[in-house]
């Protein structure tokens, strides 16, 4: 039986992870749950899965949780703060850590899991977007293992030869017969919206993803295709891919989750219903397979599968992310931080949808970027970029 810590248990990925556990009670045991401030959901999870530990972001939330659990006779020990989250990621009895805390808050707990030599089920994009080389070097040094949870990266992982799977981030794609990686994306809810109408799109419209059920921040990132840009950066690190070895395709149906092109003309693809439980279950059970709870793909009900190249005028955030990778880790860190602020401002109706890309670019142009040599350096770049972004939002929304 595999013992799990789930970082970000009350979020979308965390809840889907627990659903896979629910379908496979004899295969997985939840040792620790870590979350932000959603006390009610954490209480439900603790009462159902009886983890040894539960960690909340702050003492107030932890106290509320403690009272709720005591009322139900739960023996789960309640802790709070980032240090406690890092300790849960490095517990001796835990072998697998689901890293699903969104944003920069997930960096240190994920790094703690890596340094403890765990198998990390990586759903936190920011880990590689902001700390790609630092994290990949630490994975090798600590003999940890990264398994990608993102549906696209998981699809690529499944389509790669074992020689690359077992040397992720360092294997030479060309020497293993790989020509290129094809990263697919739906194009989001505004794929066919006239360009002149994009400025008027509302947060609720942006969050109506045509295929996937996701949180509001990542739904907006899908609408701008910043999500695909961050995935591009992540894929470059995970698969040791050069720019010429990466292709990005719009695939509106979200049936083919990504592909790998080989030197002999073969293309291997991973297909499935758009359900995050599939890649989650794959990483949890790898190299074996377990039931995910997802519906099987019915080929007889499929419509045509279509593909097109991305329009960078429609999706400037995608191009911005690709260019940031070439500038270095400081640029990708600053872009990610700025985007979190601008998306939050859009969701709060402080700026227009079309302002997101322009503000992100403005932050990059206003920063003197020095390459980070440590996680502390990364966090400093992150903090500065957020402050610059906040000032840009205030200036624009006056």
UniProtKB/Swiss-Prot annotation:
Its EC number is 1.1.1.267. GO terms for biological process: isopentenyl diphosphate biosynthetic process, methylerythritol 4-phosphate pathway involved in terpenoid biosynthetic process. Pfam families: DXP_redisom_C, DXP_reductoisom, DXPR_C. SUPFAM superfamilies: 1-deoxy-D-xylulose-5-phosphate reductoisomerase, C-terminal domain, Glyceraldehyde-3-phosphate dehydrogenase-like, C-terminal domain, NAD(P)-binding Rossmann-fold domains. It catalyses: 2-C-methyl-D-erythritol 4-phosphate + NADP(+) = 1-deoxy-D-xylulose 5-phosphate + NADPH + H(+). It comes from the Bacteria. This is 1-deoxy-D-xylulose 5-phosphate reductoisomerase. It comes from Salmonella typhimurium (strain LT2 / SGSC1412 / ATCC 700720). The gene is dxr.
């Amino acid at each position: 039986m595999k013992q799990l810590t789930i970082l970000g248990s009350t979020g979308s990925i965390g809840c889907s992870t627990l659903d896979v556990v629910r379908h496979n009670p004899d295969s997985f045991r939840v040792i620790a749950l870590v979350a932000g401030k959603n006390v009610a959901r954490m209480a439900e999870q603790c009462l159902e899965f009886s983890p040894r530990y539960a960690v909340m972001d702050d003492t107030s939330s932890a106290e509320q949780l403690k009272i709720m659990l005591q009322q139900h006779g739960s023996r789960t020990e309640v802790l709070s703060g980032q240090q406690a989250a890092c300790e849960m990621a490095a517990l001796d009895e835990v072998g697998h850590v689901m890293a699903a805390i969104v944003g920069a808050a997930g960096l240190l707990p994920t790094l703690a899991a890596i340094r403890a030599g765990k198998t990390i089920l990586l759903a936190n994009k920011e880990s590689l977007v902001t700390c790609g080389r630092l994290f990949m070097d630490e994975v090798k040094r600590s003999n940890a293992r990264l398994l990608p949870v993102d549906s696209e990266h998981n699809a690529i992982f499944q389509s790669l030869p074992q020689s690359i799977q077992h040397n992720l981030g360092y294997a030479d794609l060309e020497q293993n017969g790989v020509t290129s990686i094809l990263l697919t994306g739906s194009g989001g809810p505004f794929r066919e919206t006239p360009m002149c109408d994009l400025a008027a799109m509302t947060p609720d419209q942006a969050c109506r993803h045509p295929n996937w059920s996701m949180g509001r921040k990542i739904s907006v990132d899908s609408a701008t295709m910043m999500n695909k840009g961050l995935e591009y950066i992540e894929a470059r690190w995970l698969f040791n891919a050069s720019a010429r070895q990466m292709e990005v395709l719009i695939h509106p149906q979200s049936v083919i989750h990504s592909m790998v092109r080989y030197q002999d003309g073969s293309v291997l693809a991973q297909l499935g219903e758009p359900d995050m439980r599939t890649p989650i279950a794959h990483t949890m059970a790898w190299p074996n397979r377990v039931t995910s709870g997802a519906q099987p793909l019915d080929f007889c009900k499929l419509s045509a599968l279509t593909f097109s190249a991305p329009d960078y005028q429609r999706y400037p955030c995608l191009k911005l992310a690709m260019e940031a990778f070439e500038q270095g880790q400081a640029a990708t860190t600053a872009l990610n931080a700025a985007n979190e602020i601008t998306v939050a401002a859009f969701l709060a109706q402080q700026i227009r949808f079309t302002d997101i890309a322009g503000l992100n670019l403005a932050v990059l142009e206003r920063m003197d970027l020095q390459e980070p040599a440590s996680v502390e350096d990364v966090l400093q770049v992150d903090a500065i970029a957020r402050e610059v972004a906040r000032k840009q939002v205030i200036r624009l929304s006056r």
